[in-house]
From Swiss-Prot:
InterPro entries for the chain: ATP-synt_VA_C, ATP-synth_a_Xtn, ATP_synth_asu-like_sf, ATP_synth_asu_arc, ATPase_a/bsu_AS, ATPase_F1/V1/A1_a/bsu_N, ATPase_F1/V1/A1_a/bsu_N_sf, ATPase_F1/V1/A1_a/bsu_nucl-bd
Protein name as catalogued: A-type ATP synthase subunit A
Function: Component of the A-type ATP synthase that produces ATP from ADP in the presence of a proton gradient across the membrane. The A chain is the catalytic subunit.
Protein location: Cell membrane
HAMAP family documented for this protein: ATP_synth_A_arch
Gene3D superfamilies for the chain: 2.40.30.20, 2.40.50.100, Bovine Mitochondrial F1-atpase, Atp Synthase Beta Chain, Chain D, domain 3, P-loop containing nucleotide triphosphate hydrolases
A molecular function (GO) term: proton-transporting ATPase activity, rotational mechanism
Annotated catalysed reactions: ATP + H2O + 4 H(+)(in) = ADP + phosphate + 5 H(+)(out)
Species per Swiss-Prot/TrEMBL record: Methanococcoides burtonii (strain DSM 6242 / NBRC 107633 / OCM 468 / ACE-M)
Lineage: Archaea, Methanobacteriati, Methanobacteriota, Stenosarchaea group, Methanomicrobia
Length: 578
């Protein structure tokens, strides 16, 4: 190991070194074991390094080597179905090398150098190519065609292009200036990949979760935050989104959360089928596991590694969704590193640059036209874990300033066993208006009206609840009693959803539309019956109303709903409502 510097001081994950003359964010190898670290501050001859591995046992005087390169990820075929740690070391490879517990100083390539891929060129000798252009295709999984692109900084005329089976680091293309291009490229994680232009998000991300799709939709290329106290369902909601959202690629970052949550994902995803393709969900997924017992500094790296991989697939024209669970743990890591650096603390001890770092991350989301002329998107959904469910704390507040969708999880709802426990009164989506045209064309012309009516009902219910708690619902006029009843149906029949039920876990948009329309239909029939003098107790005791609650669990939903709605019309006719 070439020694060109040494350790001066060690303070937890922060190490001060002298004699290496680095640039900001250069990767350095620290100590005799060559622990990986990144330069985060330079002051005179001293450089401060955050180390991405455990620093126990390091001492002043140990050697430090500067690689001269920024922290980069390897991009190419073989990313899908992988599970990495925060600095893109494949965990299965590390397990083979050293067993179930990660030891220090072990390196592993992000992409398998021995695996062979079949490359089919789409360009010819003599063609002009520039950064981002597609050279050829590799079938990475059964449904994902991996487009091999020219690295963004390279352009020229093709002198030679090969076809056949190659390893990722073998040359597949040579330009006239002698530049060799392989299937693999490296990209520094802190810099966003270039695009031709950013686009307005116009299509919704269909998640199969009724409260998200129906009430608070997110667009493909949008940003969302899921804040909530412990046990309110953040991780289950994130996993539901990773399982069922209609994107091509999912990048799931477990950032500082429990290890058994990542184990759940690893156990479930290979067995679950993608509703679009019928293939195992793992085939479209990249997992980055940086659990709470791993070094805190690597949490920052894991977030940047994940978004860079997402950008790479976006540049191929794919829709990517990225789940970060949880950005609060990353912010806590920033706070710890900042305090070790003795920086002036901001609100609640977080560094003053917390907002800048969060926006830097979320701004890498978006719908774009790539350098290859293809439309792709990254949808970023970040969980936030405010201590005690306090939404006024800095991480939640700074995140809310950046994102356009706010899914507020409520501990009271989760205690009442209402899941997903997203509070419909405090949540919001700023994409609703922009997506209205899409809903009119693809779902139903009356969808927006149905949604607005349901939200009005829930708002009225919340206002009436204050009176009900004082005097009871029987003291209300009958029309207000009916409002409470229909609002309860919207809550229990539509908003509640069982993530562990084989049918109800995923609800297609067509089914959501029909279910909400049937509840609205009951409200219309009941109002007409009430106005024609039918007593309230007869209206709320009809059997078809209770049967409507069970329809969403039926595999043959359309047939079951038709039977219930026909019965409802008959029952209202019998009691004199029609």
């Amino acid at each position: 190991m070439e020694v060109n510097g040494e350790i001066y001081r060690v303070a937890g994950p922060v190490v001060t070194v002298i004699g290496i003359k680095p640039r900001m964010y250069d990767v350095v190898k620290v100590g005799h074991e060559g622990l990986m670290g990144e330069v985060i501050r330079i002051k005179g001859e001293q450089a401060t390094v955050q180390v991405y591995e455990d620093t126990s046992g390091l001492k002043p005087g140990e050697p430090v080597m500067n690689t001269g390169l920024p922290l980069s990820v390897e991009l190419g075929p073989g990313l899908l179905e992988s599970i990495y740690d925060g600095i893109q070391r494949p965990l299965p490879v590390l397990q083979e090398k050293m067993g179930n517990f990660i030891q220090r100083g072990v390196t592993a390539n992000g992409l398998d150098r021995e695996r062979v891929w079949e490359f089919k060129p789409t360009v010819s000798k003599g063609d002009e190519v520039k950064g981002g252009n597609i050279l050829g295709l590799v079938q990475e999984t059964k449904n994902i065609e991996h487009k091999i692109m020219v690295p963004p900084s390279i352009s020229g005329t093709i002198k030679e292009i090969k076809a056949g089976s190659f390893k990722v680091d073998e040359t597949i293309c040579v330009l006239t200036d002698g530049t060799e291009i392989s299937m693999m490229q490296k990209w520094p994680v802190r810099g966003p990949r270039p695009v031709a232009k950013k686009l307005m998000p116009t299509k919704p991300l269909i998640t199969g979760q009724r409260i998200l799709d129906g009430m608070f939709p997110i667009a493909k290329g949008g940003t969302a935050a899921i804040p909530g106290p412990f046990g309110s369902g953040k991780t289950v909601t994130q996993q539901q989104l990773a399982k069922w959202s209609d994107t091509d690629i999912v990048v799931y970052i477990g950032c500082g959360e429990r290890g058994n949550e990542m184990a759940d994902v690893l156990n479930e995803f290979p067995e679950l089928e993608d509703p679009k393709t019928g293939r195992p969900l793992m085939e479209r997924t990249v997992l980055i596991a940086n659990t709470s017992n791993m070094p805190v500094a690597a949490r920052e790296a894991s977030v940047y590694t994940g978004i860079t991989i997402a950008e790479y697939y976006r540049d191929m024209g794919y829709d990517v969704s990225l789940m970060a669970d949880s950005s609060s743990r990353w912010a806590e890591a920033m706070r710890e590193i900042s305090s070790r650096l003795e920086e002036m603390p901001g609100e609640e001890g977080y560094p003053a640059y917390l907002s800048a770092r969060l926006s830097e991350f979320y701004e890498r989301a978006g719908a774009v036209n790539s350098l290859a002329g293809l439309d792709g998107s990254i949808t970023v959904i970040g969980a936030v874990s405010p201590p005690g469910g306090d939404f006024s704390e800095p991480v939640t507040q700074n995140t809310l300033r950046i994102v356009k969708v706010f899914w507020a999880l409520d501990a009271k709802l989760s205690q009442r066993r209402h899941f997903p426990s997203i509070n419909w009164l405090t949540s919001y989506s700023l994409y609703t208006q922009g997506l209205a045209d899409w809903y009119s064309e693809n779902v139903g012309a009356d969808w927006t009206q149905l949604r607005d009516d349901a939200m009005d009902l829930l708002q009225q219910e919340s206002e009436l609840q204050e009176i009900v708690q004082l005097v009871g619902s029987d003291a209300l006029p009958e029309d207000q009693q009916l409002t409470l009843e229909v609002a309860r149906m919207v809550r229990e029949y539509f908003l509640q959803q069982n993530a562990f039920h084989p049918v109800d876990t995923y609800c297609p948009f067509d089914k959501q539309y029909k279910l909400l329309k049937s509840i609205t239909r009951y409200g219309e029939l009941a109002t007409a019956a009430l106005e024609s003098g039918v007593p309230m107790n007869k209206i709320i005791t009809i059997k078809s109303k209770d049967e409507l609650a069970k329809v969403k669990f039926e595999e043959n939903f359309d047939a079951a709903l038709d039977v219930v709605m026909k019965k409802m019309d008959e029952e209202f006719a019998q009691i004199g409502g029609n």
